[in-house]
Amino acid sequence: MATIGKNIKRLRAKQGLSQDDLARKAELKYSTLAKIEGDFVKKPGVQMVAKIAKVFGVAMEDLLK
């Protein structure tokens, strides 16, 4: 089972975004996004997940699968 960090990284690569690009679009700190992708943050907040999902145009649940 993939982690939220791996799912974000996969979608980000698929859309050709850098971590910095995604962080800016989702209005998150680059360091926060890097920690989520690196699985240092196992359970990011709902608001963070919602912002990232919105950038990707997917449901929050898709990031959690």
Where are these regions (language model features)?
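Alpha-helical residues within the helix-turn-helix
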Residues: A13, R24, K54
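Short alpha-helical DNA-recognition segment
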Residues: L17-K35
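DNA major-groove recognition helix of helix-turn-helix/homeodomain DNA-binding modules
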Residues: Q47-D62
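Alpha-helical DNA-recognition elements
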Residues: K35, D39, K51
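A short, Lys/Arg-rich alpha-helix, primarily the initiator
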Residues: M1-K14
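Short hydrophobic/aromatic patches at helix-to-coil boundaries
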Residues: T3, E61-K65
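Key DNA-contacting residues within the recognition helix of helix-turn-helix
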Residues: K9, A34-K35, L64
